[in-house]
Amino acid sequence: MSEVKLTPEQNEAIHSSGKNILVSASAGSGKTFVMAQRIVEKVKQGIEIDRLFISTFTKKAASELRMRLERDLKKARQESSDENQACRLTLALQNLSNADIGTMDSFTQKLTKTNFNRVNIDPNFRILADQTESDLIRQEVFEQLVESYLSGDDGLNISKEKFEELIKNFSKDRNIAGFQKVVYTIYRFASATENPIKWLENQFLKGFETYKSLIDLSADFSADIKENLLIFFELLETSLTNGVVAKKGAGRDKANLILDNKNELLEAITTKDFATFTELFLSIDTDIRVGSSKDEILSALKKDFSVQKQDLVGSKSKPGEIRKFVDKIKHGQLIEKYQNQAFEIAENLQKFVIEFYQSYLERKKNENAFEYSDIAHFAIEILEENPDIRETLREHYDEIMIDEYQDTSHTQERMLELLSNGHNLFMVGDIKQSIYGFRLADPGLFLEKYKDYAKTENPNQLIRLKENFRSRGEVLTFTNDIFKHLMDEKLGEMTYGKEEALVQGNITDYPVESEKDFYPELLLYKENTSDEETDESEVRISDGEIKGAAQEIKKLIEAGVEPKDIAILVRSKSNNNKIEDILLSYDIPVVLDEGRVDFLKSMEVLIMLDVLRAIDNPLYDLSLVAMLRSPLFGFNEDELTRISTQGSHDLRFWDKILLSLNKEGQNPELINPSLENKLKAFYKKFTEWRKLVNQVAIHDLLWKIYTETYYFDYVGALKNGEIRQANLQALAVRAESYESSGYKGLFKFVRLINKFMEQNNDLASVNIKLPQSAVRVMTFHKSKGLEFDYVFLMNLQSRFNDRDLKENVILSRENGLGMKLIADLKDEADVITDFPYALVKMETFPYMVNKDLKQRAALSEEMRVLYVAFTRAKKKLYLVGKIKETDKKSGLDLYDNASLEGKILEDKFRNSSRGFQHWILALQNATKLPIKLNVYTKEELEAEKLEFTSQPDFKKLVEESEKFDNIMAHSDEIQKAQKIMNYEYPHQAATELSSIQTPSQVKKRSYEKQLQVGEIQPKSEFTRVKKLDFSDFGPKKVTAAEIGSATHSFMQYADFSQADLFSFQATLDEMGFDEKIKNQIDIAKILTLFDTDFGQFLSENVDKTVKEAPFSMLRTDEFAKEQYIVRGICDGFVKLTDKIVLFDYKTDRFTSSSAISEIKERYRDQMNLYSEALKKAYDVNQVDKYLILLGGPQQVFVEKLDD
């Protein structure tokens, strides 16, 4: 990117200074490059790098920026002819590791630790990074507080009676889960404000103080209805003149009556006289029927009239927009009567939440463990209350730089205000990619500056980076066409105009002229609902959608596209399991970036949870029997039945086991010797586990169970065994995390897991070693910042998640609380019931206002999510959805009448939660998008699948095989390889000798002289240990073997031609290692290899290097005098014209030259074997052998082995 000529806007963003600058950087515009170059320029100008405050959104982004800066600073130093400037760049490189480049969380932690005394906390605090621990503490505080209120303790803010009313308003029956959810929701929202207690005290009840009646509602409440009325009146007037409504009859009379009352209805809405409007509208008959016509044109007009009238007015059973508004008014008139009751509940809720917040914070102080939000609030308090610290920092930082500014929260914004001197902010972001509203980021902060800075009189500066250097023109044109008709100020929070449109910046790699082959494709699976179960919510993806995408991916791969250049983006990871299974059935390698779902529901984890429950309480029959039936003990149904008959039906199964063991049951003769022995073995092991519960950690207990029962090995042999083993490891790690947080006891751990499962929550997914070139599956959110040649957007017909709009409370920063009220309408005149009460849940006025705000914000964010997804594609975009064959209203004809209102899609399509597909199909009909539409059925899928899996023509196969054999017979390379690969055993007597051995085994046999021929036994590299030392159970720490294996894998995939920190770190990040293992791989030390002559040799001969080279070779055993095959893998070799240079990595630890000599001797025989194999395979006489020693303290050593 640095070699590309700067655009004028990029140049301006790099060099402008002396004012606040907002850079609106569209997708693919090179914002990270711009930010890095600006920092380099600052250093060149004499600003020390530690005088820049650089905030990134994630730790990964900070690491990548730091690596990019190292590369760019080095390059700038090499190119600089100014000695002083070169010195500054050198100093910046030296101080780069100490520069303030990181997340806002990391900065606030540092600030708080440094000034801990100003907020009266211990400087050795820790972060509650584990959700489990914070959940447990919060739960305990909540339960204690609720108990104190329900017990009626003196000195509390709320009486017992009023507190019970508060709980009942949000919870069902005696369950307080609903109330707890409300409290946690408010706590989380308040924590995202810059001062939670202040917000709770001053803003929480603002909505109740502002909106006391219908007339208090803002103009937005009735704005849409006025527009709909005008459309309805115009529809009637047009229909009276064009013959749609007959010249005589009831229809014309009704239409005229409505139009006669037109002015009165509009006046009532304008003056907010909602009672008059409702009374007048309901007195008018709007049921206008127009019938049909034989005239084709008139028939179409009548049909269009009926559709529009239904949307606008509707009927009592199916109300349109105007009737819905009338229902709102009637509801509002009712809620006015109960406003005081609602306000009292809201006040009590405020009191409880404030006390909960303070109690929870006090508990965290006692634990000396805080959430990230707590630390941020401490940092704000330090800066607000201590002018000396604030001014020192303001003087220290020459510039405050913020990446991804569109995702800033109000807490972070306050920090920036306190650190800035008022004219040194440099903010980079893209409002169109603000997609973290669920994390309480506020795009309004960016939007406000975006609009203000655009004004000519504003002293600050707005710079727009519009050129997209990532994508082909077809992707950009399609993206522009979608969003210029979808986004506006009303819905989308901004107008997508000329200034916001993407411009193709890469005209070197991609042509300017469009090519139809690269047009985005809309793949719609036409589902026959009789063939597949249909989920009404349409959250679950159908097999047909995935198979359609899989077949397109298969075509791309067969055309030469690397799987790693393809991504599948999904709304949520709930469909990951199905996507992975279907792609694998097409032989498509796949990586799930966020793992498989339902970890807690996986078979192996469910079994282990039953084991833990049974150990905790053997009287729990379900878990005890499940454990006995499991592979751990393998009791079959017949055996369990025999045990069950030993006691009465109501006797616990554990007691029946004891009766069976003592032959004291009702039917002792059914306990045969085989079953008796099985029970004794179970009892011994099970009671031993129970005794250990109070002696060892749960983590250790789990690993004891895994190893003693061989269950860990058992699941490893099943399908997806590696994933299953990782799940068991994750369960043990979760137990360790639970206990390291200060919690003890199996009972509490089981309770915690049960609570997770009750709430349909899951624990974190697990990472396993992944293929290096595979199709990646990730959520839309996860894809942000990434790019792929080909992108598939799945399940587009899925409805937007609008659950938040149905919750008991909806919060807003300005209005505070909006809540639903449960009121007893027993005494209302029009309520007739025989029950003692008539409870109805109603939306209060603040709830109605907040709900409208939230709905608009949610739909606006969905638009931005779609924008992010579109702009991940470099070459081509595939949109995959579904329509139903038997439901026309869910099919394509629903969009026949879609049109634009001005330049924007009609609100009836935009203001809908029906999903992305709904928007795209409406726009396709309204504007004719540059997209290819492909509708396919299950039958077409199956026919195309046959092309991938059809049986071959065997006659043709034989002919091709003969041709191939002829080619193989004349290939020099193949003949050389066959010298090793095609050796055959001449003797069949060597049955006692392992027929295939590794170099390590060959080496071991060379010094086992005491073995006799008759004593030689087949060896395995893995020896099962039945009893493990207790302290060694489980992977508590990263082992040297794991680090060595990971290091070898890294060296295999690293590109030696680009041996720099930036490239190597990027490779390491892509490899998917566990974070603990990744942190142990010392990239800086590995790079010292390339400072040696041998390292330079490897860099210069990448095209001649073979890595991870497998070999096979026939050897004769010196004792058995029989032949066996040696198979192994050498780390690599360089094939030159006259010789081969062999190298192998070793991670053995050493600190002295004598230790190096020992390592050389240790691996001499192994390297000689590799050398012998290469000589035979390539018919060469010289193989130079080198050990690359990675286990030294500071640098890599290269040692040559003599023959």
From Swiss-Prot:
Cofactor(s) the record lists: Mg(2+)
Residues that, per the record, bind ATP: A25, S26, A27, G28, S29, G30, K31, T32
GO molecular function: 3'-5' DNA helicase activity; 3'-5' exonuclease activity; ATP binding; ATP hydrolysis activity; double-stranded DNA binding
Ranges of residues in domain UvrD-like helicase C-terminal: 503-785
Keywords, ordered alphabetically: ATP-binding, DNA damage, DNA repair, DNA-binding, Exonuclease, Helicase, Hydrolase, Isomerase, Nuclease, Nucleotide-binding
Keyword set includes DNA damage: yes
Catalytic activity from the UniProt record: Couples ATP hydrolysis with the unwinding of duplex DNA by translocating in the 3'-5' direction; ATP + H2O = ADP + phosphate + H(+)
Alphabetized InterPro entries for the sequence: AddA, DExx_box_DNA_helicase_dom_sf, DNA_helicase_UvrD-like_C, DNA_helicase_UvrD/REP, P-loop_NTPase, PDDEXK-like_dom_sf, Restrct_endonuc-II-like, UvrD-like_ATP-bd
A cellular component annotation (GO) from this entry: DNA helicase complex
EC number(s) reported in the record: 3.1.-.-, 5.6.2.4
GO biological process terms, semicolon-separated: double-strand break repair via homologous recombination
Stretches of the chain forming a coiled coil according to its record: none
Nuclease found in the keyword field: yes
PANTHER family recorded: ATP-DEPENDENT HELICASE_NUCLEASE SUBUNIT A (PTHR11070:SF48), UVRD / RECB / PCRA DNA HELICASE FAMILY MEMBER (PTHR11070)
Family to which this protein belongs: Belongs to the helicase family. AddA subfamily.
Oligomer and partners: Heterodimer of AddA and AddB/RexB.
Protein name: ATP-dependent helicase/nuclease subunit A
Source species: Lactococcus lactis subsp. lactis (strain IL1403) (Streptococcus lactis)
Gene that specifies this protein: addA
